[in-house]
Regions:
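Ligand-binding cleft/hinge of the Venus flytrap
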Residues: 52-54, 66-75, 116, 137, ...
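Short beta-strand-to-loop elements that line the ligand-binding cleft
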Residues: 76-83, 147, 164-175
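A ligand-binding cleft/hinge motif common to bilobed small-molecule-binding domains
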Residues: 86-89, 103-111, 156-159, 180-181, ...
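Short loop->beta-strand "edge-of-pocket" segments that line small-molecule binding or catalytic clefts
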Residues: 36-42, 137-151, 165
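Periplasmic-binding protein-like
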Residues: 120-128, 174, 191, 195-237, ...
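Extracytoplasmic small-molecule ligand-binding "clamshell" domains
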Residues: 27-102, 111
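Ligand-binding clefts/hinges and TM-proximal coupling segments of bilobed small-molecule sensing domains
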Residues: 152-169, 206-208, 236-263
Length: 263
């Protein structure tokens, strides 16, 4: 009997040691619900996804999407403003729980973060004045093209035209300002964002030159948080069925939600 008890005690001790790391590392979904707050990184300079209104309040498609997430979780929402290049670093250093800032998927990014199902449909392209005869990456020549560093358009443009005169800025607002002021002849940006820019800057031409790629937006989280990812996918599926995402597309993107490609 003593031998049996000693063996049982040893098994229990080993089991406790194995389970301890799992218990110490709470899963992110449970952690958010336990704390009662979800921290979401968003843009403050990329209308209509995220920008500051006249009252200096954040508004836009991604802001409303973050509110939808917080409401469905039953927690408070903490919005964290980030430039494009800081979206993944903020996730990796646990400054935010998730990123909802018009991020499109790439294989390189997937080495660092996990992507939810797509929640918004957009595309990336190059724009400039009507007088510029640019119809592809091969036509860029000596024309300087500006892009926000770390964005998908930066990655695609660099691969497409590595020898082009690419001006990379720290954030989207600076990239737009460089184009508006004439420091760059072309702008690589999200087509939905450019529609909004054209409305706000009627004296500047935003003529479509060529497409870079279709770029649906995804919520991103840290790798390994599978429970949170499954929950986000469920929310996006539900919001597609009940019309919430279509409503956001009509409100912010100017039209109905098109069918999005599966992951």
């Amino acid at each position: 009997m003593i031998g049996f008890r000693a063996a049982l005690a040893a098994v229990i001790a080993v089991s406790a040691a194995l389970l301890a790391p799992l218990e110490a590392r709470a899963d992110k979904l449970s952690d958010i619900i336990s704390k009662g707050v979800v921290r979401v990184s968003v843009f403050a300079d990329v209308p209509p996804f995220g920008s500051l209104n006249a009252n200096r309040e954040l508004e836009g498609f991604d802001i409303d999407m973050a509110k939808l997430v917080a409401k469905a979780m039953g927690v408070k929402l903490e919005l964290v403003q980030v430039p494009a290049a800081s979206r993944i670093p903020f996730l990796m250093t646990d400054k935010v729980d998730m990123n909802i800032a018009a991020m499109s998927i790439t294989a390189e990014r997937a080495l660092q973060v996990m992507f939810s199902a797509p929640y918004a449909d957009t595309s990336l392209a190059v724009f400039g004045s009507k007088s510029l005869g640019v119809a592809s990456g091969a036509d860029l020549g000596k024309n300087r093209i500006v892009v926000a560093k770390g964005t998908t358009e930066d990655l695609v443009l660099t691969a497409l035209a590595p020898k082009a005169d690419i001006m990379r800025t720290e954030d989207n607002a600076t990239a737009v300002q460089a184009y508006l002021s004439g420091h760059a002849q072309l702008l690589a940006a999200n087509s939905v964002v450019v529609v909004e820019l054209a409305k706000r800057n009627p004296d500047k031409e935003f003529d479509f030159k060529f497409a870079l790629r279709r770029a649906p937006a995804h919520i991103t989280i840290r790798r390994g948080e599978h429970d949170l990812l499954r929950w986000l996918d469920t929310l996006i599926f539900q919001s597609t069925l009940n019309g919430d995402l279509d409503e956001l597309h009509r409100k912010w993107l100017g039209g109905p939600m098109r069918p999005l490609p599966p992951m």
